[in-house]
Amino acid sequence: MGKKLIGLVKLALNAGKATPAPPVGPALGQYGANIVMFCKEYNARTANKVGLVIPVEISIYEDRSFCFILKTPPAAVLLKKAAQIQSGSGQPNTKKIGSISLQQLEEIAKTKLQDLNTQDVKKAMKIVKGTAKNMGIKIND
């Protein structure tokens, strides 16, 4: 029989920049997990993705050991990077603040595919397109 799971923690952290300070410290500290070891492992595994927010799902076991799974960056972060903007529009229906090409949309959809509830790239593109629309980003055909 495997180890008994005592906690599942989901965090969204900047790649390569996890520190024992909040939010990591309090989230893992309550389970007695080794915070410094997590930070070192996370930073090592995300070193090539600096500048992106990488969500992580941490499973903490009874013996205080842990394992974690890295997810893909949120669609909004990828869209902001592609459109070269700092934040979404306050009025996405009337004020467009950037645009991306159909190829960029497809690349983002392919990146997000493993975390979306579809295996079809066209459907994934529709999901990401909806996020872009809500951010005030125009898709150029």
From Swiss-Prot:
Keywords: Chloroplast, Plastid, Ribonucleoprotein, Ribosomal protein, RNA-binding, rRNA-binding. GO terms for cellular component: chloroplast; cytosolic large ribosomal subunit. Its main location: plastid. CDD domains: Ribosomal_L11 (cd00349). SUPFAM superfamilies: Ribosomal L11/L12e N-terminal domain, Ribosomal protein L11, C-terminal domain. One of its GO terms (molecular function) is large ribosomal subunit rRNA binding. It is found in: Plastid, Chloroplast. GO terms for biological process: translation. It comes from the Eukaryota. PROSITE patterns: RIBOSOMAL_L11. InterPro entries: Ribosomal_uL11 (IPR000911), Ribosomal_uL11_bac-typ (IPR006519), Ribosomal_uL11_C (IPR020783), Ribosomal_uL11_C_sf (IPR036769), Ribosomal_uL11_CS (IPR020785), Ribosomal_uL11_N (IPR020784), Ribosomal_uL11_N_sf (IPR036796). Part of the ribosomal stalk of the 50S ribosomal subunit. Interacts with L10 and the large rRNA to form the base of the stalk. L10 forms an elongated spine to which L12 dimers bind in a sequential fashion forming a multimeric L10(L12)X complex. Forms part of the ribosomal stalk which helps the ribosome interact with GTP-bound translation factors. Belongs to the universal ribosomal protein uL11 family. This is Large ribosomal subunit protein uL11c. The gene is rpl11.
